Regions:
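Cytochrome P450 heme-binding "Cys pocket" and the immediately downstream C-terminal segment
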Residues: 190, 306-307, 406, 424-465
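Cytochrome P450 heme-thiolate monooxygenase catalytic core
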Residues: 93-103, 137-294
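Conserved cytochrome P450 K-helix E-x-x-R motif and the immediately C-terminal K′/meander segment
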Residues: 46-56, 321-363
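Hydrophobic, well-ordered secondary-structure elements that form the walls
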Residues: 340, 367-370, 393, 417, ...
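C-terminal helix/juxtamembrane-tail motif
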Residues: 2, 14, 463-478
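Central I-helix of cytochrome P450 enzymes
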Residues: 176, 180, 264-316, 340, ...
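N-terminal membrane-proximal hinge/A-helix region immediately C-terminal to the signal-anchor transmembrane segment
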Residues: 2-121, 145-150, 353, 358, ...
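Conserved cytochrome P450 K-helix/beta-meander segment immediately N-terminal to the heme-binding cysteine loop
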Residues: 320, 375-402
Length: 478
């Protein structure tokens, strides 16, 4: 009886203690809406409803480069902050438990490993597979080029057939799947632009929405069962079967990731599912990112505006007149790809990290240990002091030597530091080879049947075209 009489007082004392702790925290003195000193529920609401990226961007526009998102989370939007968070000590601060959502087959992978020391150890035996020297090998480039030809042939067949248009969202994600599996598994890669089963594999990987269930698992594990019932996560039997079977096949090509992983598994004691888990993680990471970035870019180049048609014309001119020049030595192509990654970064959202023991000073503010800190590419890439007219697609900005260092410091499409995107060189090679194949010989325009929403829609860590469809017409010009 006495316990129940005293319970309200215990609750009141606990609430008051928590309130005092939050008000005394250095985080409470940072810029941001007043409610964020007390709760992160508004942030979680926007995340649950696909709006976290735009919510944070709006806060930065109002409050400046340092914004409190909640009692224990802060967002930054400067090059110095990004350097401190993601590059200090070589690989920046440790990842937060958020990345535990990305385990595969119950096994932690390079991406989902939290402590940077463990990540550094794992990266040592994988990094050379994604080094530019490996990606530039003829065996890899020839394979990607063939997949680019498959993409263009499929699009031309559809345009000159009964459809009269090509849905490049589908074909680009097929191309991205084929490109990444070529590097992962050759000679056991996919041919999704030619093979119906591989097409279904791509659809399983790309046509799903697991944001709500993942957010529930992370923030409210006790509620995840209810959310799973309302919005069940989509199973992935085809991709799981493909990865499990393929990762056990013998004699993969020496340049492949599978070759390196199998050799490592023989030389050391690895977890039972370590090889397929790592392969599945790289497979999932390499499809939507490259496919979405190319889709946003080709849609923009095909818009019926003078600005878009000018860029497409200049790109065609450089590619058509320099057929024998290596793709990595074409300045305008490079500028178009960089501007695409600035305007449509494959992962535009926050990359959360945890402030280490003892706390840190970021942008002149002391941030206590355990605080979640992050930057998001979407906001960094729109700094008007570094990128004048940030909402305009201007490849020429990357050809200007003035301000080059500042632009590169804020370029965050692949994150930065030792934990930045391992596959950046592969992604850029895929984008450039695909664009060269298409725009050296074709012109693209929007189909009259193109009515899909091309706004960015946030997923758990990446964003994609909301309508997941982009209908273009391809016309041969040579």
């Amino acid at each position: 009886m006495l316990f129940w009489l005293l319970l309200p007082y215990f609750v009141l004392v606990a609430v008051l203690f928590q309130a005092v702790q939050r008000l005394r925290s250095p985080v409470a003195r940072l810029p941001g809406p007043g409610y964020t000193a007390w709760t992160s529920l508004v942030l979680k609401y926007h995340e649950f409803t696909h709006g976290r990226r735009l919510y944070i961007h709006a806060l930065h526009r109002r409050y400046g480069p340092v914004v409190r998102l909640g009692p224990g989370e802060v967002s930054f939007a400067t090059a110095d902050a990004a350097k401190e968070i993601y590059m200090s000590g070589g690989s920046g601060y440790d990842k937060t438990p958020f990345y535990s959502l990305f385990t595969q087959f119950g096994t932690r992978t390079l991406f989902s490993t939290l402590p940077r020391a463990d990540h550094s150890y794992m990266k040592r035996y994988l990094a050379d597979r994604y080094a530019n020297t490996n990606i530039m090998k003829p065996d890899i480039l020839n394979g990607i080029s063939q997949h680019a030809r498959d993409f263009l042939n499929k699009c031309l067949d559809q345009c000159y057939g009964s459809d009269g248009f090509a849905d490049i969202y589908v074909s680009l994600h097929c191309f991205a799947l084929d490109g990444v599996t070529h590097q992962l598994f050759h000679p056991y890669g996919t041919h999704a632009n030619r093979n119906e089963r591989d097409l279904r594999l791509m659809q399983e990987l790309s046509y799903h929405d697991s944001l709500k269930s993942n957010v529930a698992i992370y923030y409210m594990p006790w509620l995840s069962g209810v959310v799973h019932y309302i919005s069940p996560p989509k199973p992935a039997p085809l991709s799981n079967e493909y990865v499990l079977k393929t990762s056990a096949l013998p004699s993969p090509s020496p340049f492949s990731l599978l070759s390196k992983l199998q050799a490592q598994a023989k030389a050391t004691s690895m977890a039972p599912y370590a090889v397929p888990a790592e392969c599945k993680d790289h497979l999932a990471a390499g499809v939507d990112t490259t496919g979405d970035a190319l889709c946003f870019l080709m849609h923009h180049l095909s818009l019926p505006t003078p600005a878009s048609q000018r860029v497409q014309g200049l790109l065609h001119k450089e590619l058509a007149e320099n057929a024998a020049v290596p793709f990595d030595q074409l300045p305008y192509l490079d500028a178009v790809v960089k501007e695409a990654l600035r305007c449509f970064p494959p992962i535009p959202m926050s990359m959360p990290r945890c402030v280490p023991r003892g706390g840190s000073t970021i942008e002149g503010h002391f941030i206590p240990q355990g605080t979640i800190v992050s930057c998001q590419a979407y906001t960094l890439h729109k700094d008007p002091d570094v990128f004048p007219n940030p909402l305009e697609f201007l490849p020429e900005r990357w050809l200007d030597k003035a301000g080059e260092a500042e632009r590169n410091r804020l370029f965050f499409a692949f994150s930065s530091g030792g934990r930045g995107c391992l596959g950046r060189h592969l992604a850029i090679a895929e984008m450039k080879l695909l664009l060269r194949e298409v725009y050296s010989q074709c012109r693209t325009t929007l189909s009259s049947q193109m009515n899909s929403d091309m706004e960015m829609e946030d997923q758990i860590i990446a964003s994609r075209p909301k309508g997941q469809s982009c209908k273009l017409v391809f016309e041969k010009v040579v």
